[in-house]
Amino acid sequence: DSDAAKIIVNKYRLGDGITFSAPDGGYNINLRGFLQTTFETRKYEGDDQFYSRFRMRRLRLRLSGDAWGGKVSYRLQTDFAQANGGDGELSGMLLDAFIAYKPVKGLTLSFGQKSTPTDNRELGITSNTLQLVDRSKLSSYFGSIREVGLFVDGSFRIGHTAYLRPSIVITDGD
């Protein structure tokens, strides 16, 4: 019996994707996607015709998982639509590609391409949970959104209701 034959579908929940797991819980693999489309119809003054267009704004596929009791995790996320904002600018197809290690509870070391903790608060919200379809123009123009580098993130509870979440980031600066 091979190990591949023992992989089971652990769970499926709409919005969370499908999760495959080892029977002993040693590793998990999650596959999920996100699709956002736009259809516009316009009629200009002095013109009797309607102009329409259909756009695939976001078409994202994400593969993530963990192993060794959650000590090691990874994420690979792509955007096949390559649309950035509402102005048709092209962005990179690869959004996230990183591996993370948790040596102790509350501390995570990551290496690769991922979102940075140094951007404004709006960029900490994922695209599929925004209140409006687009981010603000300020965030689109001035946010770095994702960087390649080494990330050290902490999360330490202080008292009953507060957390201290320090971050240290060394990136390529693009």
State each model region's role.
Residues 1-19:
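Short coil-to-helix leader/linker segments, especially the first N-terminal amphipathic alpha-helix
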Residues 17-173:
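Outer membrane beta-barrel
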